[in-house]
A protein has these predicted regions:
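Short amphipathic, basic-aromatic surface patches that mediate peripheral association
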Residues: 81-82, 95-113
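Solvent-exposed serine/threonine-rich low-complexity stretches and specific carbohydrate-binding patches
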Residues: 134-143
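C-terminal motif of bacterial Sec signal peptides marking the signal peptidase cleavage site
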Residues: 19-23
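Short acidic/polar inter-strand loop motif in beta-rich domains
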Residues: 168-181
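Bacterial N-terminal signal peptides that target proteins for export
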Residues: 1-12
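Short, low-complexity, disordered segments immediately C-terminal to signal peptides
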Residues: 24-46
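Aromatic sugar-binding surface patches on proteins
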Residues: 143-150
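Short coil-to-beta strand junction motifs in C2/discoidin
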Residues: 90-94, 110-121
Length: 208
């Protein structure tokens, strides 16, 4: 009888232990759920690339759709670059950028919004009389918010200007043309021009 009671008691103890472990496991799963939700929330609230870059871009105007490209023009404080090209930051009025991405219907094999490399991007800044006050070629470069074409500009007087980017196609960039792997589009043969008219520049209104 004692042996039977012992066996019964052992069985009950085993069942109780199993129940306790199951309850602990369920509680642990419940306790860990907020952590997963918290992680999801943190990911959702994380800044997108470039949002926390530490500088504020000012637009030259609205984005311009030209050919297979979407072109944005921005400017902000002069920057140091490696290697140093053009005007040093200390002698510059601003850093200007052409953000050039592929349009959704580009037919050149780029994904919509992809940076388009290998371009030659010339710029011209004209006063309202049509006189060119600055011109040159933007350089391909990377910043903390990604690749672009840019340059530090020499000192520029306050005024209202028309800014143009003249975009030439890649000179040594091949396209597949066969039926199996080829793309439908072809690179443009004449420079594409993205224009930003009536840009107002006031060096006393910026923080740098």
């Amino acid at each position: 009888m004692k042996r039977s009671l012992f066996r019964v008691g052992a069985a009950l103890a085993t069942l109780a232990l199993a129940g306790t472990l199951a309850a602990c496991s369920a509680q642990s799963s419940t306790d860990s759920k907020p952590s997963a939700d918290s992680s999801t929330s943190a990911e959702a609230n994380a800044p997108a690339p470039g949002e926390d870059a530490g500088f504020e871009e000012q637009p030259l105007g609205d984005e311009v759709h030209v050919g297979p490209l979407v072109v944005g023009g921005v400017y902000f404080q002069p920057v140091e670059m490696e290697p140093q090209v053009g005007t040093p930051a200390a002698d510059s009025s601003m850093h200007i950028e052409a953000d050039i991405a592929a349009a959704a219907d580009n037919k050149l094999g780029y994904g919509a919004g992809d940076f388009v490399p290998g371009l030659t991007v010339d710029y011209a800044i004209k006063d309202k009389s049509g006189n060119v006050v600055q011109e040159g070629t933007l350089m391909p470069m990377n910043a903390s918010d990604g690749p672009h074409y840019g340059l530090n500009l020499p000192k520029l007087d306050a005024g209202t200007y028309d800014v143009s980017f003249m975009i030439k196609p890649p000179s040594v960039w091949l396209l597949h043309t066969d039926k199996t792997t080829g793309v439908e589009g072809r690179f443009w043969t004449e420079p594409l021009v993205a224009e930003f008219p009536d840009w107002q520049w006031d060096p006393t209104a910026v923080s740098w």
